[in-house]
């Protein structure tokens, strides 16, 4: 009976993992959003104000995008606004979110001693 329970648990975890993986936004979409926001931030200040007004209208209008895409656009826009306020030394978003993180043993951790 125990092997059947373990098999059922394995199958349910596999199904849940596949469902979660399908909901992740593909890397190409993330890069496209980043390029669009960078191009918009390079334009003049007058058009930036118009772009900001346009994006707030489309965000609330239910443009047919998934909630993950809308949230991603908001995050990228917020990062660009913060970067433009910090000046020339501002950091730029250059990578996509990490989907899986493997545990890494940092120097000194896991040794169990305080020396």
Curated annotation (Swiss-Prot):
Keywords: Glycoprotein, Proteoglycan, Signal. The keyword Glycoprotein applies. Residues 33-96 are annotated as: Disordered. Residues 1-16 form the signal peptide. It comes from the Eukaryota. Glycans are attached at residues 61, 63, 84, 88, 109. This is Chondroitin proteoglycan 8. It comes from Caenorhabditis elegans. The gene is cpg-8.
């Amino acid at each position: 009976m125990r092997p059947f329970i373990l098999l059922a648990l394995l199958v349910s975890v596999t199904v849940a993992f596949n469902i979660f993986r399908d909901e992740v936004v593909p890397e190409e979409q993330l890069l496209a959003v980043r390029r669009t926001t960078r191009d918009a931030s390079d334009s003049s200040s007058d058009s930036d104000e118009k772009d900001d007004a346009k994006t707030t209208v489309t965000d609330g209008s239910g443009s047919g995008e998934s909630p993950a895409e809308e949230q991603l656009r908001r995050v990228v826009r917020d990062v660009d606004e913060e970067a433009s306020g910090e000046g020339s030394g501002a950091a730029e978003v250059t990578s996509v979110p990490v989907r899986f993180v493997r545990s890494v043993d940092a120097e000194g951790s896991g040794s169990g001693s305080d020396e």
